[in-house]
């Protein structure tokens, strides 16, 4: 499934894998874009899979003419060995009935590559929130049981809120309670599979609505940064400036090109 760019397979032992879910507003994918661009991560390979719709395009992180002609495909892997980070970016939607197969293959690769844990950046429909969720922060997290032991103290210190359980069938008052992530794509499947396989996984998500979701992506990646400290403020004083996230060059065309002047 994983195909390296070079002749040898990179050593990812004890790396943290960051990846998005293809979810409402594409918030996770935009957040991963910010991480790759800000850290100037190096592409180390891609996934050869029939589970996603094929696509090809220009390098979304091009900074100069020399690398603007590089091609990108639907699933690519980037790494930053100095921070023990590896990132999987997904750029297209799943083919019908193929998402579960992708999750199984992905987790098999994670186990074989020696990655220490997975962090999934996702989103969920804001209109599905209950009253308690409406009155609190829009961010939630989930941890698999085997990850809770090692990070629960850190998470507790951040005062984060865990994703609440809701009725499996909302229309039935006697329905059992379970984790539901409407609009979350493969998030729930990945989480359930990781629980059953005892893989260390965290899910960080935000309740959002469709639209201009760049602010949601920035806030989600800053939520992640509270935990991992991927980047730090320019100064530590009370007037510390905003974190210096680097916007990818491809975001200039996020909503298409401008209106032709001839229209006016």
UniProtKB/Swiss-Prot annotation:
Any one biological process term the GO annotation gives: chaperone-mediated protein complex assembly
One term under GO cellular component: protein folding chaperone complex
Signal peptide: none
A molecular function GO annotation: molecular adaptor activity
UniProt cross-references to InterPro entries, sorted A to Z: Proteasome_assmbl_chaperone_2 (IPR019151), Proteasome_assmbl_chp_2_euk (IPR016562), PSMG2_sf (IPR038389)
PTMs per UniProt: Degraded by the proteasome upon completion of 20S proteasome maturation.
Residues recorded as bearing Phosphothreonine in the entry: 137
Cellular location(s): Nucleus
Top-level taxon in the UniProt lineage: Eukaryota
Keyword terms: Chaperone, Nucleus, Phosphoprotein
Function according to Swiss-Prot or TrEMBL: Chaperone protein which promotes assembly of the 20S proteasome as part of a heterodimer with PSMG1. The PSMG1-PSMG2 heterodimer binds to the PSMA5 and PSMA7 proteasome subunits, promotes assembly of the proteasome alpha subunits into the heteroheptameric alpha ring and prevents alpha ring dimerization.
Assembly with partners or alone: Forms a heterodimer with PSMG1. The PSMG1-PSMG2 heterodimer interacts directly with the PSMA5 and PSMA7 proteasome alpha subunits.
Assigned protein family: Belongs to the PSMG2 family.
Name of the protein in question: Proteasome assembly chaperone 2
């Amino acid at each position: 499934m994983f195909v390296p760019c070079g002749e040898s397979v990179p050593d990812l032992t004890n790396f943290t894998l960051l990846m998005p879910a293809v979810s409402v507003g594409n918030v996770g994918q935009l957040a991963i874009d910010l991480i790759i661009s800000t850290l100037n991560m190096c592409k180390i390979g891609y996934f050869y899979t029939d589970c996603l719709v094929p696509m090809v395009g220009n390098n979304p992180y091009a900074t100069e003419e020399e690398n603007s002609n590089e091609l990108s495909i639907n699933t690519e892997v980037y790494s930053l060995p100095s921070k023990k980070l590896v990132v999987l970016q997904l750029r297209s939607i799943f083919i019908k009935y193929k998402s579960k197969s992708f999750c199984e293959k992905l987790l098999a690769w994670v186990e074989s590559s020696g990655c220490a844990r997975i962090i999934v950046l996702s989103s969920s429909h804001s209109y599905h929130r209950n009253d308690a969720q409406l009155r609190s922060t829009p961010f939630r997290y989930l941890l698999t049981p085997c990850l809770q032991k090692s990070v629960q103290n850190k998470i507790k210190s951040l005062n984060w809120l865990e994703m609440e359980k809701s009725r499996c069938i909302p229309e039935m008052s006697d329905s059992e309670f379970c984790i539901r992530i409407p609009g979350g794509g493969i998030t729930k499947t990945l989480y359930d599979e990781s629980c059953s396989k005892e893989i260390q996984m965290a899910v960080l998500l935000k309740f959002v609505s469709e639209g201009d979701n760049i602010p949601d992506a920035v806030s989600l990646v800053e939520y992640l940064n509270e935990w991992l400290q991927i980047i730090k403020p320019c100064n530590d004083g009370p007037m510390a400036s905003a974190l210096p996230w680097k916007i990818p060059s491809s975001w200039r065309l996020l909503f298409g090109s401008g209106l032709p002047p001839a229209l006016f």
